[in-house]
Regions:
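N-terminal mitochondrial targeting presequences
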Residues: 27-35, 41-43
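Short beta-strand/loop motif that positions the catalytic acidic residue
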Residues: 212-215, 219
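N-terminal chloroplast transit peptides
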Residues: 1-23
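C-terminal catalytic histidine-bearing segment of alpha/beta-hydrolase fold enzymes
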Residues: 225-269
Length: 269
């Protein structure tokens, strides 16, 4: 087992190395002027009492047919993934009319990192199978994502996705969200938390949502076996799951993964 500081360095290094901000800016403003960054927004859903914090959005077309919510990993922000979703950035949406919403997690003390404050969707106590799980934090983050979904037009198809810790929240919301327009779920380098709480906590109609999981076979942070176990649990529950591994990829992303996600979205939406 690696030391906590080393594991946190791997987490932070992996999440921040995914997309270079400079490349993101040039693609969005120069080559693809039609994809407009909507900027940061901070709102509070009074009905739920949930502060949604800041988020960034990229929109192409006046009336999105598809909205993707993508959650970053531990220690990162929305900026770390924005470049993957501008046209030509990596992930291709199956419609010219879309919106991508990238929330940023609130800053929390992370037990695994000796209480250091960083953007986190929930606390992490350890990275082994027997570690304590922050159930309350996971469910709070899932509710935040569900509140964002509720703000979208009911006719818009919704995709929930994320990387690492963000993927764990996306999977949780994908199984629990009651919104009928949630159409697909994507998780990269991630795992399904609270697996024993299902099927009792599944939302009506959740089993209709296809799930696409992706993992590097050299991941030293979230083990590939966690991804495999998540796939198997989802299949036990009755979900249609696709699972892809990428040779030599650590806790990161790669062009082949983006291509696979693009193909999944094209076939699922």
């Amino acid at each position: 087992m690696q030391s906590a500081p080393l594991l946190m360095m791997l987490l932070l290094r992996a999440s921040r190395a995914l997309v270079k901000p400079a490349a993101r800016s040039s693609r969005c403003s120069a080559r693809y002027a039609s994809a407009q960054p909507l900027g940061k927004r901070g709102v509070t859903d009074g009905s739920e009492g949930i502060t949604l914090f800041g988020s960034e959005a990229i929109q192409n077309g006046a009336a999105p047919a598809v909205t993707v919510f993508w959650l970053h990993g531990l220690g990162d922000t929305a900026d770390g993934w924005a470049g993957a979703f501008v046209p030509g950035g990596g992930v291709t949406l199956p419609t010219p009319d879309y919106k991508v919403v990238l929330p940023t997690a609130e800053t929390l003390p992370v037990t695994l990192n000796m209480g250091m404050q960083m953007p986190a969707w929930f606390d992490i106590f350890g990275l082994d199978a027997g570690a304590q799980v922050d159930e309350a934090g996971i469910l709070k983050a899932s509710k935040r994502l569900e509140a964002l979904v509720a703000m979208e037009d009911p006719s818009t198809k919704i995709v929930l996705g994320g990387f690492s810790q963000g993927g764990a929240v996306a999977l949780t919301a994908g199984l629990r969200c009651k919104a009928k327009n949630v159409a697909a779920v994507v998780g990269t380098s991630t795992w399904l938390p609270l697996g024993d709480s299902y099927p009792s906590k599944l939302a009506d109609g959740a089993l209709k949502r296809p799930v696409s999981l992706h993992h590097g076979d050299a991941d030293e942070v979230v083990r590939t076996s966690w991804g495999v176990a998540s796939k198997e649990r989802l299949e036990e529950l009755g979900f249609k799951v696709s699972f892809a591994t990428y040779p030599g990829m650590a806790h990161s992303a790669c062009p082949e993964e983006f291509d696979a996600i693009s193909s999944f979205l094209k076939s699922s939406l």
